[in-house]
Design a protein with these regions (language model features):
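Compositional signal for N-terminal targeting/processing segments
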Residues: 1-184
């Protein structure tokens, strides 16, 4: 079964700035609390894998000393970890806009429609959810998710859509937490 935990992305990664209390993205105490929560849930569910909406590239781009909270927990617990999100090159290959290309596209649509840029950008990102979630499913599918206990950490905005996608593919899935963001 896949147990979905939604959170904010800033809690998914440790960086030197967070450890030193210099980050504007997340507080050290919040990341520590999320890390403890993952350990607790993994033990409770007897998880043998923690997968996440992230890629190694995305984690590294977060800054100096960056590493995945989920990967760290999995390593310490001696269980498998899996990055499920496509990296920049893979996103382009499957037709998704990324980085500056996405920002420019959102700016163009914003000007043409006279809508706020942030509103347009958020809508454009959400249009890509189903494609990205299909990649996550494909990567998890090879792990026989119906025959084991897998925790899947993702952004809170994906919790309902990813659960629905898993249900449609006849995968056992539950929402463990819709939005774990304590003090983020």
């Amino acid at each position: 079964m896949i147990h979905i935990i939604g959170t904010c992305h800033s809690l998914q990664v440790w960086t030197d700035a967070i450890r030193n209390g210099e980050s504007l993205d997340a507080r050290k105490e919040s990341v520590e609390a999320f890390e403890s929560y993952l350990v607790e849930v993994a033990r409770l569910l007897k998880a043998d894998m923690i997968a996440e909406e992230a890629s190694g590239e995305w984690v590294a781009a977060r800054g100096h000393g960056a590493y995945s909270v989920a990967k760290g927990v999995a390593t310490r617990m001696g269980i498998q970890h899996l990055f499920c999100d496509p990296d920049t090159g893979q996103r382009r290959t499957i037709g998704l806009k990324v980085g500056e290309e996405l920002r420019t596209h959102a700016m163009t649509v914003s000007k043409e429609t006279r809508r706020e840029w942030t509103e347009v950008h958020d809508a454009e990102v959400k249009k890509q959810f189903s494609t990205r979630e299909a990649v996550w499913f494909e990567r998890l599918e090879g792990c026989e998710p119906n025959n084991r206990s897998i925790i899947f950490v993702c952004g809170a905005d994906h919790v309902n859509t990813f659960k629905a996608a898993l249900d449609a593919k006849k995968n056992l899935a539950s929402i463990r937490c819709r939005c774990w963001t304590k003090g983020a």
